[in-house]
């Protein structure tokens, strides 16, 4: 079941859903708006990115006020908010329609597991033929929360739990990709 604004506020007030910093006006009728943090990560260099060897050639940058995402550019960004989901709530990350109408695609693989905590790393892609300027602290995406039908056997304890700042791919840590 998708959570309403009342349920979202109730979970935050009880301390079961943690959002830091929390801005009450960002609770919408069925979602919570999250803001853009101050870090981006750019993939640089040439050649193949080998998923077994980890991410090389990633440059993490901090910005004060804004940055421009160039046409057809892909980069990682992070939310300003650090969130902590209770073990019975999952969330979907959705881009804001107003930004999508500019050609900005916002993802994070779209899913936040129950029990996750950390800042959310976002994948941004500018499909426009013009640069798009994004500002630190602007509302960038929204979380849609859903209550699980029953408690999970195990909550999220993966490689991104507790992440702060923009975090590049850690796919090389997946069990099936580890070198023998």
UniProtKB/Swiss-Prot annotation:
Biological or metabolic pathway of the protein: Pyrimidine metabolism; dUMP biosynthesis; dUMP from dCTP: step 1/1
Q: What is its EC number?
A: 3.5.4.30
Kind of enzyme, top EC level?
hydrolase
Q: Which Gene Ontology biological process is one annotated for this entry?
A: nucleobase-containing small molecule interconversion
Q: Which InterPro entries match?
A: dCTP_deaminase, dUTPase-like_sf, dUTPase_trimeric
Q: Does Nucleotide-binding count among this protein's keywords?
A: yes
Query: What is catalyzed by this enzyme?
Result: dCTP + 2 H2O = dUMP + NH4(+) + diphosphate
| Residues forming the catalytic site | 123
Site features described as Important for bifunctional activity, chain residue numbers: 110-111
Molecular function terms from GO: dCTP deaminase (dUMP-forming) activity; dCTP deaminase activity; nucleotide binding
Q: Which UniProt keywords apply?
A: Hydrolase, Nucleotide metabolism, Nucleotide-binding
| A Pfam family it matches | DCD
What is the top-level taxon of the source organism?
Answer: Bacteria
Cross-referenced SUPFAM superfamilies: dUTPase-like
> Binding positions for dCTP?
96-101, 113, 121-123, 142, 156, 163
State the similarity comment.
Belongs to the dCTP deaminase family.
Question: What does the function comment of this entry state?
Answer: Bifunctional enzyme that catalyzes both the deamination of dCTP to dUTP and the hydrolysis of dUTP to dUMP without releasing the toxic dUTP intermediate.
How does this polypeptide assemble, per the annotation?
Homotrimer.
Output this protein's name: dCTP deaminase, dUMP-forming
What is the native source organism of this protein? Aquifex aeolicus (strain VF5)
């Amino acid at each position: 079941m998708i959570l309403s604004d009342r349920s979202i506020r109730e979970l935050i007030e009880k301390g079961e859903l943690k959002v830091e910093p929390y801005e009450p006006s960002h609770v919408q009728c069925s979602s919570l708006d999250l803001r853009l943090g101050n870090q981006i990560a750019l993939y640089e260099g040439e050649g193949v990115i080998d998923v077994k060897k980890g991410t090389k050639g990633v440059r993490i940058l901090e910005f004060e006020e804004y940055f421009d995402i160039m046409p057809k550019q892909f980069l990682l960004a992070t939310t300003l908010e650090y969130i902590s989901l209770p073990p019975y709530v999952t969330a979907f990350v959705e881009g804001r329609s107003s930004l999508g109408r500019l050609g900005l695609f916002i993802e994070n693989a779209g899913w936040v597991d129950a029990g996750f905590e950390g800042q959310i790393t976002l994948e941004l892609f500018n499909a426009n033929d013009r640069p798009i300027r994004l500002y630190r602290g602007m509302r960038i995406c929204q979380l849609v929360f859903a209550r699980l039908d029953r408690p999970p056997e195990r909550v999220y304890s993966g490689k991104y739990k507790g992440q702060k700042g923009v975090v590049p791919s850690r796919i090389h840590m997946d069990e099936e990709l580890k070198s023998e």
